[in-house]
């Protein structure tokens, strides 16, 4: 039935989510649009390069956004790449290695939005009802993607990696695979501004 949408049969995580007894207080930061991001992926060819994160941060700079960087301890080197290229970004909160796998679904549920490539955390975000921005790069989003409230950003001409035909090397560099246009950055900003939690943050700031 082509009339059905993701809202007719939403996916969900097993509830109640495991809530840690203690957790980083910054997850409760008030008056901010909390955006979770994954800067790396198991398949390193799916890792979004630093320049793309900088472009996203710059486009959202006039909004009260905080970027929460999730990841396993061995992903710190990717955060170091961003720091080497652009210095310490003031609204990037490094949670790499600080959230256990058991605590991850609940922690991601605290986000207002999640931005990443086709990696595990976008599916966790989707399962806990967090809107997703998928930077699909070389991955076929027609075949597999989060199915909830999702914004797709990328170029279909770059699609060449599939569920049963995964590739680890590509003729294009990652900067080309994940390139974002001005139009797609505008769509991203519009998507963020349309989130109910974002509107509350704007109201709190008097915007």
Residue ranges and their predicted role:
Residues 52-137:
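Donor-binding and catalytic core of enzymes assembling or modifying cell-surface/extracellular glycoconjugates
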Residues 20-21, 100-104, 157-163:
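A short acidic, often aromatic-flanked loop/helix-cap motif at beta-alpha or helix-coil junctions
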Residues 45, 77, 124, 142-143:
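Glycine/Thr-rich phosphate-binding loops of Rossmann-like dinucleotide-binding domains
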Residues 1-46, 50, 198-206:
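Mid-sequence helix-capping/hinge segment at a functional interface
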Residues 41-43, 74, 139-140:
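Short, glycine/serine-rich, charged loops/turns that create anion-binding
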Residues 94, 126-206:
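Nucleotide-sugar donor-binding patch of glycosyltransferase catalytic domains
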């Amino acid at each position: 039935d082509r009339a059905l949408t993701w809202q007719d049969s939403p996916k969900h995580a097993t509830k109640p989510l495991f809530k840690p007894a203690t957790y980083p207080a910054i997850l409760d930061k008030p008056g901010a649009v909390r955006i979770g991001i994954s800067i790396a992926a198991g398949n390193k060819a799916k890792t979004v390069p630093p320049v793309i994160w900088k472009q996203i941060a710059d486009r959202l700079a006039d909004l009260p956004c905080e970027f929460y960087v999730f990841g396993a301890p061995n992903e710190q080197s990717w955060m170091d790449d961003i720091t080497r290229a652009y210095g310490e970004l003031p609204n990037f909160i490094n949670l790499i290695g600080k959230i256990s796998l058991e605590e991850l679904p609940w922690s991601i549920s605290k986000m207002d939005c999640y931005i990443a490539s086709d990696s595990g955390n976008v599916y966790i975000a989707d399962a806990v009802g967090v809107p997703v921005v998928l930077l699909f790069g070389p991955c076929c989003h027609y075949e597999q993607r989060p199915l909830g409230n999702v914004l797709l950003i990328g170029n279909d001409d770059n699609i060449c990696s599939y569920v049963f035909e995964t590739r680890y090397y590509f003729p294009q560099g990652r900067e080309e695979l994940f390139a974002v246009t001005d139009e797609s950055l505008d769509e991203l900003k519009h998507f963020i501004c349309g989130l109910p939690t974002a509107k509350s943050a704007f109201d709190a700031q008097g915007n």
